[in-house]
Amino acid sequence: MGLLQDGKWVDKWYDTKSTGGKFVRTVTQFRNWITPDGQVGPTGTGGFKAESGRYHLYISLACPWASRTLMMRKLKDLEDHISLSVVHPLMLENGWTFEDGPGVIKDSLFNSDYLYQVYLKADPTYSGRVTVPVLWDKKTNTIVSNESAEIMRMFNTAFNDITGNQDDYYPADLQAEINAMNDFVYPNINNGVYKAGFSTNQAVYEKEVKNLFAALDKLEEHLVDKDYLVGNQLTEADLRLFTTLVRFDPVYFGHFKCNIKSLVDYPNLWDYTKRIYNHAGIAETVDFNHIKQHYYGSHKTINPTGIVPVGPDLDWTL
């Protein structure tokens, strides 16, 4: 765990002393957009035209933020058009690495040992956390984006004319509802598990974990007569929630002390999570070994021994 400071790697955990024990997530810095014609997107600069073979995605199978871009790459038939690297599950003194291991796909562009070296190729003076996902442009040799929510949106539409896949996970008639759901899920659940798990103050932890479960209670009620969060189809809102729920019992329940209830104690949420897991293409993007190895093995301030639990033994069949 660490970050870059003026282009120099520093092994440094999150600073919670200055925030009263609270975990505060930093804002991603690369915010350009791939568009069908290369015109500028909602943020950043233009020049990133959707082209087959031009872009490369760096992800971690353990990371929920990266995994949602991997799912969108799969669902939108982009695997033959956007190449892929997968980091090692352990993130220790050198951050994310490309060390050999099951499921690791080396850096085919630069043969990097560490992901921070990729960041430095885009900006030799970069300061900030080195996170996944990273969407790289081979033509201009820079990072297009390291913001997972925006990469999902790019994958959803920018390459439609290339792939012929017109499936829409952010349809116009549902966008307002999807945005509202995302605005609820992100702070309370996606980031909520981290705000509980990375807190270093008892009162802060208790506040955050109670807020998390209050949000889960609301979604349990919301799903009483629904298959999906919004409308009658799979949308980006489901993908964004799923990557947290699928990790809940394997890591967040124990490692992050989010243990008021397990996910299987929520019948509607558990059925919902299994439904998404069994959607065509989703299960193959989930690697429970990477997930458990990363959290239990990387966060030495939380789990100093690095022991990875054997369980839980969950049945993902519908």
Identify the residue ranges that each predicted region occupies.
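C-terminal alpha-helical interaction module
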Residues: M1-L318
